[in-house]
Amino acid sequence: MIPAVASALDAIVGAVTALQKANGAGRAYELYIMTAIADELRTRGCDVVVLRSDGSAVAPGDTDRKFIQRGGVPTGVLPGSAGADNASCFRFRKPSSTQYWEIWNGIQFRGRSGGTHEIDIAIVPHEVGIMLRSYAIETSPTGRPAVAIECKDVGGKGSADEMRAFVARLYDLTILGVHSRVPHLTGAKQRIYPGAPPGNDSFQHFWEGNRRTLNVIARRTGFAAGATAMTSYYAIQPRGPVFPGTVEDADLTNEVSDWIMTNLV
């Protein structure tokens, strides 16, 4: 998987000088899926760049063209003032659009309960990244991303409990119109709404929220019988077995990219 990651980064950056990845097969799996999506968006005409952790873009002529994957325990977004040697992300803009988006790996999102939930791969408005990097401390965004992908590089097949846990996580992250007075919610610029940008319209109910976002569980080994029973109602996309060379691998990259090109501004 790592050679494929390096190839995708080379195509986006114009040859990376170094790839600093986190330890563990599961983290490599996340990075593989993340970079495949970014590179596919590039082939479809999107303007795709790597952002350093201080928010600066990596240009082909830069001496420092490394990509850093977040290691250690999950966190929120670190302040840009902490420097450029923390986790990298991707920024992209669709053809003929003025709106930028960011692709994150392993960021903690804050829910209505006040608890945090790690999303393996998330796509959020660029404005959210700018705001969080401007803070003096590590901060989690509040709400759910436009795209949420859970990556499972494990031997056993996915269970119904795994699916329930993902649905529950998304439920806590969903900000509905009736939740404006929930005490844990932060300032408006730190929240993520389905219509932001350009608007701030909140979801009316969880069912709607799931259909105005893209939510995927990608597994190397697929799913056990009964694990996907609730996916249709909750609009969760189960994909597996996803690993290099499989039909599901190519389908996942294409389906996520199709959704982005069709649904994001």
Roles of regions detected by a PLM:
Residues 24, 28, 32, 116, ...:
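Short, well-structured alpha-helical interface segments that form or flank functional binding sites
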Residues 244-265:
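C-terminal helix of von Willebrand factor
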Residues 14, 18, 22-76, 80-84:
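Nuclease catalytic cores
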Residues 1-13:
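N-terminal hydrophobic or amphipathic helices/low-complexity stretches enriched
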Residues 128-129, 138-237:
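Acidic, metal/cofactor-coordinating or nucleic-acid-engaging core segments within structured domains
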Residues 36, 118, 165-169:
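Alpha-helical scaffold elements adjacent to nucleotide-binding pockets in ATP/GTP-utilizing enzyme cores
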Residues 58-144, 156-157:
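Active-site metal-binding core of divalent-cation-utilizing nuclease and nuclease-like domains
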